[in-house]
Amino acid sequence: MKTTYASPADLPADQGAKPAVLVWDAPVRVFHWLMVLSFAGAYLTAESERWRLLHVTLGYTMVGLVGFRIVWGLIGSRHARFSSFVRGPAGVVRYVRSLFKGQPEHHVGHNPAGALAIIALLGLTLAIGASGWAVYNDVGAEWIEDLHEGAANF
């Protein structure tokens, strides 16, 4: 299995090519690839009545995976914890400013902008799951189906 590392190029010049640092643990990697496969499968089966049960099952799987990631983000290993990379709006602004200055802040793992994207994707996945559940159970109006499809295509 390949390992995700912090870039050795980011080390100070006097440290040379020291061994890279392991960042993401196995649960985060498994979560990531199960989410990718579940989303791809759900997306590919979205328009088929024949594969509707698989589509729904993959959607529920994604919601379960988000639940797992939230728990692991609170109790997991050091770099898996949200507290290690979620820095709030001020951190995102500071990081983006450092990009525009041409001197980006170095972060092991996710930078604050990446953390914002992760939180948005987890929330979007929950919205897709909730709207999908409502569509599948005929709860609500037609706009919920539009929301479900629009969020998945976003």
Which sequence ranges carry the predicted segments?
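Membrane-embedded alpha-helical bundles that constitute the cytochrome b-like, heme-associated redox core
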Residues: 1-154
